[in-house]
Structure formats: structure tokens, C-alpha cells
């Protein structure tokens, strides 16, 4: 292969939520509560803003993110990017549309772990980013639906939307929580990081086709690695291919330029930071 240029820097945004992320929805509508006609109207506006801003800011790739599901990625992929007529309707400007069609999108599933870490016992958000080579059906059936969560008195259920809704309904009946069944269920559902790793590693479809990462707000260079949560933290960070952080001290800790061998021994690899 011949190449006439060296490295190319491209701007990627790995973590863009859609309106289906009802745990963190700042878009003014809930897709699960609208008719299909109203949802199409509202989602058209979301897609227009998403891709127009991406082009304006020269973003080359976007990680379409939702909690415990693929609904946003699925809708964007199937009803927009795979539909020339829909793309023409939303983006009549030919030049803009061509630029949008060159943007690389990939699914980012945000999960909440059942583990708590840190002085304040914070829950851990855990991202599994898949290659867009993996089909939506494979991710749903062979990854999401293979995970389980605690439902009631030691009973577990598969991680499906219908089961999450049932969990929410049960919690509302017992505790008078407000919100839709799905919202309440999503607020309470958690999964196990060892189970995630097992499902990914045991299915050859996913081999070398995913990245694991966690967002890190705190300064990892200052935390106590002798605490009770050491084993949990170590195992989670060891699974990660990279970290989502802008904390300069954490970045320095993760890159470990002054203790590379020790970092690799303890955490499996040097951790690039996004």
C-alpha cells in the first residue's frame, strides 16, 4: 500500500446521547410516550441538529449512546442513514448531505454496574462501544439479552426492555415511585461487569469488535488503592481499553510514562484517555 501523507487527526465524539436516553434526556420529548407520527417529527429535528452541528464542528465520527439499549442508534441507522429519501427530506442541501453521509457512526451502550466505588459509594457507568460491523440484531440478541439483572429475591431476568418495564412496574407497586415503568426500571437496573466480559469473550462475533471504557471524573492519582473497593476498581479498569476523562492528573496517571511496567502489570495495559 502506498500513502502520500503521514498521520491524519480527526475529531471523534464517542459519547452522544439520543432522546431514547430517558435517564438523561434534555431534548424535550420522550420517544416512548409519542405516537409514531409525532416521534418522527420530533426525531427529525434531533437528527437535523445532530448532524448539522457535527458538520459545522468537523466531527468525523459519533458514538450514538443510550442506556441499556440500542433504540437511538437503531432509529438513526435504519430510518435515516439507510433511507436516501429520508435523508433528502431532512437535508435537501446536496453538499451538506454528502458530508453527513461520510460521518462514521457506531453504537455506544451505557450500562450501570451493580458495584459502588469511591468515598461516596458512587455507581459505575460502564460503556461498551461496538464496531458498526456488528449488526443491531447481534448486539441485541447475543449481548444485551444475554446479560441478566436482579429482579426479585434472587431471581434474575434477561436485559430486555420488556423485563426492565416489568421491574419498574413492580417497584412502583411496592414503593409508589413516580414515572413510567421503563423510567423507574432503568433507574434501578444494574448488571455485573464479570458477566459483561464473559458474554463478550464467549461469542466469536464480538472478538476484536468492541471497546470497553468508563467515565472518570476524579483524580485517580490521588485515590487510595488500599481501600475496600481496590479489587473492584482494579478489575473494572483492567477490562477498559481506554478511559473517558478530561482530568489532567488522571490522564497522566493512566498514561503512566514514569511507571509503564508497573501499570501494565497491575491494570493490564496503558490506558489512552478520550
Where are these regions (language model features)?
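Acidic/histidine-rich helix-loop elements
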Residues: 18-43
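Divalent metal-dependent hydrolysis catalytic cores, especially in the metallo-beta-lactamase
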Residues: 51-70
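Extended substrate/RNA-proximal surfaces in nucleic-acid metabolism proteins
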Residues: 1-4, 27-29, 75-244
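Histidine-centered catalytic micro-motifs
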Residues: 11-21, 67
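Extended hydrophobic/aromatic segments used for targeting, binding, or gating
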Residues: 226-269
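Eukaryote-biased recognition of electropositive, low-complexity segments
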Residues: 274
Amino acid at each position: 500500500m502506498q500513502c502520500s501523507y503521514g498521520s491524519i487527526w480527526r475529531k471523534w465524539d464517542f459519547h452522544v446521547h439520543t432522546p431514547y436516553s430517558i435517564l438523561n434526556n434534555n431534548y424535550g420529548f420522550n420517544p416512548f410516550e409519542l405516537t409514531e407520527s409525532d416521534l418522527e417529527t420530533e426525531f427529525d429535528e434531533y437528527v437535523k441538529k445532530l448532524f448539522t452541528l457535527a458538520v459545522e464542528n468537523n466531527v468525523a465520527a459519533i458514538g450514538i449512546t443510550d442506556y441499556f439499549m440500542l433504540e437511538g442508534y437503531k432509529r438513526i441507522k435504519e430510518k435515516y442513514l439507510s433511507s436516501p429519501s429520508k435523508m433528502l427530506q431532512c437535508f435537501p442541501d446536496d453538499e451538506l448531505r454528502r458530508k453527513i453521509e461520510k460521518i462514521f457512526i457506531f453504537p455506544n451502550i451505557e450500562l450501570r454496574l451493580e458495584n459502588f466505588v469511591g468515598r461516596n459509594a458512587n455507581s459505575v457507568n460502564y460503556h461498551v462501544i461496538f464496531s458498526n460491523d456488528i449488526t443491531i440484531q447481534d448486539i441485541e440478541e447475543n449481548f444485551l439479552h444475554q446479560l441478566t439483572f436482579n429482579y426479585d429475591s434472587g431471581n434474575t431476568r434477561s436485559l430486555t426492555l420488556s423485563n426492565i418495564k416489568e421491574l419498574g412496574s413492580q417497584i412502583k407497586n411496592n414503593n409508589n415511585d413516580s414515572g413510567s415503568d421503563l423510567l423507574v426500571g432503568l433507574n434501578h437496573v444494574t448488571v455485573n461487569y464479570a458477566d459483561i466480559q464473559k458474554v463478550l469473550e464467549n461469542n466469536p462475533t464480538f472478538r476484536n469488535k468492541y471497546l470497553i471504557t468508563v467515565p472518570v471524573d476524579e483524580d485517580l492519582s490521588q485515590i487510595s488503592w488500599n481501600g475496600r473497593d481496590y479489587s473492584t476498581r482494579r478489575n473494572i479498569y483492567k477490562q477498559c481499553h481506554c478511559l473517558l476523562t478530561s482530568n489532567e492528573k488522571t490522564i497522566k496517571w493512566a498514561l503512566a510514562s514514569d511507571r509503564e511496567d508497573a501499570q501494565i502489570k497491575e491494570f493490564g495495559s496503558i490506558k489512552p484517555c478520550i
